[in-house]
């Protein structure tokens, strides 16, 4: 992990490096440092930002482009205020030469990539560029953190392996960057070095010790990258290294493909087909080798690296401890899995980079055409050879061997005969005369066997600069059948060739043979013949093409240039005039970056500009996308003649601004063009004081910033230049001159009377800036001008303050020699002596104390003395000097920090010894009670600990320490207690081993408990396995309690696997699972649940784990227990206050929990000790949303509960296996369900509309009574709550079935099923079984359509249908009473409950006499 403290330490180190006087840093070094200081606006990615802008100047060219790019840096420097701190530290002092070097490298790279690719390499190039961008994007992001991962890996086994990955990746990046900027010849030499980088990178896939493959597979095979728990920090870091290394491995493959593709293409363009074949072959071999190692061969026993990495990622993703994506890791895993799957798919989809087969040359050559020599390249005595190459849509073979030479004798353009390719591939044919450059002469399509070598000669004739010869040869070849539509290099046709050569005779003849659309055919880069003619200055060809109606404004593919753009940049006036004769021409047409042809004409020169300026409709102030006008470009090009030509048009705006509000004058000043600057200043309309945006920098500011003293001096002397103009932040040219050390400019400023006390917005004067700068000699120059050395900034700092706090020793001494005030304090109450102590300027401190020793122990507002500041910043010489001078060695600031604490924290044993010898107070502590010993423990400095314990006459760790009394409130604790606790808490295992293993302090602090609390598994293992401590410990809270409470799953797993008791009491009457639940650690709960937890055990609050989960609002845990542990919990259980989980959920207004509980069937009618249902509580508390939900959903819970639990699986337990779920009448007598059934016609006229099902339900209750198909068995005196709940639920569900079957669909809504269930449950639970039929009957009566007088008729029918009903154990008296009871049952739905009670009281089988009837129940 990367900690804030480490980041700050790096930043401080960077400041020190920047502040060192006289040390020059490279661009990359300075960029890195400024980035660490978070000052990256000026340097981080500055080169790439500039390159991004370069695309806006495609017409300027390489050399001028470099200059223009330098100008574009202004937009990045001026993108915000010029920060004084950054500027003086060097983060704004642009190293212009270094930037140009970076640009030159990038230009060289771009030039190489712009070279044309052979058709065979185009697809490969696309694949490489597409894939490498995806890999490199994330790899570069990972690269930034990999150093931190490296530093933090301490595992002795893993560290060397990861180090190999790091070393290889660094070497790869360095070499790749080093060669990218080489010029073409140097680049090729570097790539072709024997045993060079290409060979080394190819071997990265071998198992050699210094390869990349070896450490990656070692990590995978040893399982180092699979975390064992969410706390397995080491495995996380190794996983990071594995992913970074694998992406580097993939990048190496694509880098090699890119380089071999480049080399193959280079030699193809040169015509060296042997070299082309060599690298083309290497290209394929590299791909196949790496493909095999990355994705395997497709067999199960030969998986590739990507497959193995994906397995690691999936193992991690599917691990139990990761949970449901709630640890912030899931997103990263998915991202990496998707990336590697995408790369794998991309690689697997490409079987090969080239065809495996090298074509044989079966060509038989015969000269059948009557074409005599000499013509074209055909000359008697020359030797001609042919070679072929197979081509499919995306794959190409190598070029085969050259045929035997054939001598040319009198005839040209032979016929080549070869067999038809059986696989139907195209065949490319190459030709070479003697040792000249080979040429592609044509392509044989499938099914053809004859090829006449004549089309290339026609193309060459059209390309011949000798028009007469070319026309003659073209005429002959055309007559003999050459194809005028054949295409060759880069998709160019004969029309392109003619346009380039300017042979108007050929073109004139062609115009009669082809359509005008063919004259518009673009090549692969979008150049049409008129583009080529314009770019070549062939005005006659342009004129012919215009007459044939070609598109005059067509654009190239990349830069979107029109023919007019190309003619303009070449300066072809006649061509320009021919183009302008077209009525369709758009003179202000813009290219990709917004440049018009007039912009391009700046490069074309004075004559073409004059031609433009005379045109009607020309926009002389047209702006590019970046806001540059042609006048801007003329000044950037430093071509005053061109600028003067533009100025002849009075409409030219010389003060036009670009997107950064910069005028041409700004650019002249930036680039140091003195003569151009003079010309501009002398223009009457010039505004010399325009400022850029948002930096508000004028031309004078920029001239000084870029150190062009001659330009700056000229501008200072100019009357129309404001020399005191303030940029953003109040920075004037004078301030900049000091910051940049421009002595000549400063001298001139003094001479012209510039105010030397100018202040920035923060009240920095030039003297303040000189004191902080790397130009200390300027201080004396300013003092000689009577500069105020006591001036203060907004923070109260004098120049001497700034010199000392910025570490500028020479500047501080100069100021002291001029008797400045060394006792002035700033807003922090600090004097210059504090600054000298902070930055370690010993000579300055000595100079101040030699003048005034009273400052030795003076405190600032934080109570820091010079000694304390020197100690905190590890300036050892200064510390010793201050102590020797009598400084208080035990000085403490407001936070209690003291010198001894500072050096102990940083692990400086020598200084700790020194302070011991100087009798420092070894028990001194800061405001947090931390003494030197604790700091040594927490930071892992075992050497200091051992030294301190050896100095028993000075330090005794058994002493009571009251500074940390609040951490040990019940007893007096010694230093040893806190030290051992700290060692365990801060994961310092070597110190733990020393304290416990070496010194034998097993009982101090309860180390095993502490290790479990903080999740330090390796310390837990050490204590259990090596020191044999009991896994259950000796305290009330066991180690398992601590680990569970803090969610350390790996520790919990280890302790349980080693015998820890999962149901052991913790503090407060809780167990480990209670502790885990209170902190919502689902994974720990799941593990404990699977390892013997007693879910019925109640804690001191009378709550089981389930009630605890609800009380703690641990929704995921509650849901898990209900869903996965329903066999072990009772959803309706109550605590000591008779509150169910639903009561608790309502108390906490947890609607999500309420919905969960209702969904799974909790009883909403249960009352607590205060006789309140959940609805009562919600209503009283005015929880309107909960009340609304409970009222709406309380009747639906049983159906959902049943669907969730199946057919009441809980009824299958041994406890309730005696329950008999009897069949209902509904199932035994389907004739009563369907009103259309024949049997149901018995009721026609009388009961056609009655609710038969409702009555059947009531009869079912009665029949169960007499047949003993009871809802609850009475074998035991009292049914368990679970059985009673099941019976009540079953009865209520059957009643719900009745309601669902009624024709009146609103019937269900009219009955409160929750109320029905509650009453039934209460009746069964209390033994008042007689009330059940009354409850059901009463509920049904309000919605029944049954006429009372028809009830007995219906009962009699039901009676008959039950004739076969068996009542095996019913007594005779019970059977005898059956008929009368049916009648009474009907009466019970007609009369009051009093009537029913009266009737039943006289019945021999009344429920008052229920006890007489054994084993009969409702």
UniProtKB/Swiss-Prot annotation:
Residues 1200-1418 form a propeptide. One of its GO terms (molecular function) is toxin activity. It comes from the Eukaryota. GO terms for biological process: exocytosis. Residues 238-257 are annotated as: Helix H8 is the probable transmembrane region of the tetrameric pore inserted in the target cell membrane. Processed by furin-like proteases at both the N- and C-termini. GO terms for cellular component: extracellular region; host cell presynaptic membrane; membrane; other organism cell membrane. Expressed in venom gland, cephalothorax, and abdomen tissues from both males and females. ANK repeats lie at residues 458-489, 490-521, 525-554, 559-589, 593-622, 626-656, 660-690, 695-723, 729-758, 762-791, 795-824, 828-857, 862-891, 895-924, 928-957, 971-1003, 1004-1033, 1035-1064, 1068-1097, 1101-1131, 1137-1166, 1170-1199. Residues 1026-1032 are annotated as: 4C4.1 epitope. Homotetramer in membranes. Is the main neurotoxin responsible for the human envenomation syndrome known as latrodectism that results from bites by Latrodectus species. The H8 helix is predicted to insert into membranes and form pores by assembling into tetramers. The helix is contained within a helical bundle domain that undergoes significant conformational changes during pore formation to allow exposure of the H8 transmembrane helix and transition of the toxin from a soluble monomer to a transmembrane tetramer. This is Alpha-latrotoxin-Lhe1a. It comes from Latrodectus hesperus.
